[in-house]
A protein has these predicted regions:
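Active-site microenvironment of metallo-dependent hydrolases
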Residues: 58-180
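Active-site-adjacent C-terminal substructures of enzyme catalytic domains
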Residues: 1-79, 83-93, 101-102
Length: 180
């Protein structure tokens, strides 16, 4: 925070469980994929070496589960665990590197407890078969499904303010009848 951070390489060398997440929009990245890329670049700049992409993967999956003491329920794909899964477009053969070089446009599907909550409109039948009621939204000029009503939230904010407000941390694009 504020251009200072702990010596990550030293923590890893000593076997300390290091997790990575989005802390705040003030000092961190706006989403976890951006945070992964930022952490990777920071490590390369700070230490003059690459941080293993597998280590970065663990820093956003199994390590946080251990930190919160929920590793028996979350943090890895295993029988009996909660199926919170992100499916990305495969641009690179190595899955860890693919994750570390992905951005929001790479996200094809997000499952929460095994059910779709966000994804490509090409997966419409999957959303329907799961019983998910999804709203069609635009993020970065791409049509997506989201199991929520961000449009209603944005309309409510616009109505309260009297104008359409762009929120950097909430990249949903919504057309309004009354606001340009």
């Amino acid at each position: 925070m504020y251009e200072r951070t702990v010596d990550i390489r030293d923590l890893l060398k000593h076997g300390i469980n290091v997790s990575l997440g989005t802390d705040s929009s003030i000092c961190g990245s706006l989403n976890l994929l951006e945070e992964i890329r930022t952490a990777r670049k920071f490590y390369q700049t700070e230490y003059g070496e690459d941080l293993s992409t597998k280590t970065l993967f663990e820093m956003v999956t199994s390590n946080p589960a251990k930190a919160y003491r929920v590793e028996k329920q979350l943090g890895s794909i295993e029988t009996g665990k909660i199926a919170d899964i992100v499916v990305l477009t495969r641009n690179i053969e190595d899955p860890y590197t693919n994750l570390c070089e992905s951005d929001l446009s790479s996200v094809r599907l997000v499952l929460r407890d095994g059910l779709p909550v966000y994804g490509d409109v090409s997966l419409e039948s999957f959303f329907e078969e799961s019983g998910a009621i999804a709203e069609r939204i635009r993020i970065d000029n791409t049509e997506r499904y989201l199991v929520a009503s961000p449009g209603k939230l944005l309309e409510s904010i616009a109505a309260s303010l009297g104008y359409k407000k762009d929120l950097a941390f909430f990249p949903v694009q919504k057309e309004f009848d009354n606001f340009g």
